[in-house]
Each structure stands twice: as structure tokens, then as C-alpha cells.
Amino acid sequence: MDTQKIEAAVKMIIEAVGEDANREGLQETPARVARMYQEIFSGLGQTAEEHLSKSFEIIDDNMVVEKDIFFHTMCEHHFLPFYGRAHIAYIPDGRVAGLSKLARTVEVYSKKPQIQERLNIEVADALMEYLGAKGAFVVIEAEHMCMSMRGVRKPGTATLTTVARGLFETDKDLRDQAYRLMGL
């Protein structure tokens, strides 16, 4: 990541909105923003393979559900945050991931400029590809600051997105069971 370019760009934005980039409260802002971007965009170019490839053998194929995984990310359209909770269900095929690995999977894909629909897809596809799940179902509910603080200005509005892979695509009863276990 080119932090010098980020700092220069932030300084230009500060000046472009009519502020003094040398004012006491703004002097360090370009460097702070560059450090923040290094942190919140640390998922760029990464996948969840390293997390999901560490799995444990299991005999049965009962559904695994982890819900209320908090995340935050940046909307790629306005570079404003959106945040919320991810709910994940999957059907193992002989292997299960450690519970923290599901949260880490959400984290990897949320640490980059993102849209909610793609975040759903990337998490579900990672479970299928790297864990070898028989099915994956991901529900994300989030509040978007680009809707809350600008434009339509409707704070508190939740957007829900879902994606189903494998067995969840074809089995409505399985999806319904996942919804119930997620409390949705």
C-alpha cells in the first residue's frame, strides 16, 4: 500500500474542502488516515484459505451455524463504512473449521473496499472451496453509512443479503432450518 500517496491525497482533500491542512487538528490527519487504511484494507489480495484449511475431522454432517459475527468494512462506492452481523451455516463433508475460523473468514473479506452482496458470495464460496463444505448459507445484515449520513439519510436502515451454495441452493427446508437457527 502506498501510504505516501494516501497522505498526499488526503491533504489535497482537506484543502479542497476549504480547510487548512496545516491547522493543529489536521496536521497529522493525512498520516492517521494512511495508517487507518493500512489496517482496514489489510484483506486486499488475501483469501480465507489459511484459516479454513486448518480443519478437524468429523464423522457426521450436521449443520454448523455461527451467528452474530460483527464486521465493519468500507463501501467501495462512497468509501464510507458499513457494518453489521454475518450469520453462517454450513454442512460439513468430513471436516469442520474451528469456530474462530468462521469469524476470521468474514474478517478477511471485509478488510477491503467491498459491497455487501460480494461479501456474502466471498464468504460462502470460501467455505465451499477451502473447507470443502457440502453446502454454505450466509446471511449478512448491515447498516450503510452512505445511506445513513448522506443521500436518503435513513439511519438505522438494515440491508439483508443472502447467498446459498451446494445443498442450501436446492433444499428449501435446509435453508429454513438455517434461518431458524440464526434467529431470523
From Swiss-Prot:
Keyword rRNA-binding among record annotations: no
Pathway per the UniProt entry: Cofactor biosynthesis; 7,8-dihydroneopterin triphosphate biosynthesis; 7,8-dihydroneopterin triphosphate from GTP: step 1/1
Gene behind this protein: folE
Protein name: GTP cyclohydrolase 1
Family: Belongs to the GTP cyclohydrolase I family.
Native organism taxonomy: Bacteria, Bacillati, Bacillota, Bacilli, Lactobacillales
Oligomeric and partner information: Homomer.
Gene Ontology biological-process entries: one-carbon metabolic process; tetrahydrobiopterin biosynthetic process; tetrahydrofolate biosynthetic process
Catalytic activity: GTP + H2O = 7,8-dihydroneopterin 3'-triphosphate + formate + H(+)
Source species of the chain: Streptococcus pneumoniae (strain ATCC 700669 / Spain 23F-1)
HAMAP family: FolE
Enzyme class: hydrolase
GO MF terms held by the record: GTP binding; GTP cyclohydrolase I activity; zinc ion binding
The UniProt record lists the keyword Nucleotide-binding: yes
SUPFAM superfamilies in UniProt: Tetrahydrobiopterin biosynthesis enzymes-like
A Pfam family per the record: GTP_cyclohydroI
The entry's keywords: GTP-binding, Hydrolase, Metal-binding, Nucleotide-binding, One-carbon metabolism, Zinc
Binding locations of Zn(2+): 75, 78, 146
InterPro entries documented for this protein: GTP-CH-I_C/QueF, GTP-CH-I_N, GTP_CycHdrlase_I, GTP_CycHdrlase_I_CS, GTP_CycHdrlase_I_dom
Disulfide bonds: none
EC number per UniProt: 3.5.4.16
GO cellular component terms, A-Z: cytoplasm
